[in-house]
Amino acid sequence: MAAKEASFDVVSEVNMEEVKNAIQIALKELKNRFDFKGSIADIKLENDKLVVVAEDDYKVEQVKDILFGKLVKRNVPIKNIHFSESEKALGGTARQYGDLISGIDKENAKKINTAIKNSGIKVKSQIQEDKIRVTGKSRDDLQKVMALLRELDLPMALEFNNYR
């Protein structure tokens, strides 16, 4: 019987349905919160970008904190959301845009690949568009690679799927 290779994919994804659900729950909480009564506070999703609008920068940060709490409860990695600087909007309000990062860019894919190669674990890794496929003869080696990748300090959250 031939030795079968095991593999898994390293991906970085944001579940848009969960983001939409978290936004709805956060908006409900904003309507009921005493410190937001009568003030402007809104969260929208426009073209895969989060838009947070509030009366001032302080309230924008409060709205983001509420949203982050809801996203964490729904297992959406907040590491994959990169907010820009706050800017002035119409009506004296403040606005911030948040980019939702999905997929592993080439620069970070190379860092991950290099870390796997330098670890000395007997596996092969290939960059495939926005994910990385890791293959090896032993499932134990693959689990060592997963542990190694969890330790890396990257600007995105990594997930592992297609474990075979």
From Swiss-Prot:
InterPro entries in the cross-refs: DUF520, UPF0234-like_C, UPF0234_N, YajQ-like_sf
GO molecular function: nucleotide binding
Keywords tagged on the record: Nucleotide-binding
Annotated GO CC locations: cytosol
Top-level lineage group: Bacteria
Gene3D superfamilies (UniProt xref): 3.30.70.860, YajQ-like, domain 2
Homology family: Belongs to the YajQ family.
Role description: Nucleotide-binding protein.
Protein name: Nucleotide-binding protein EF_1165
Organism of provenance: Enterococcus faecalis (strain ATCC 700802 / V583)
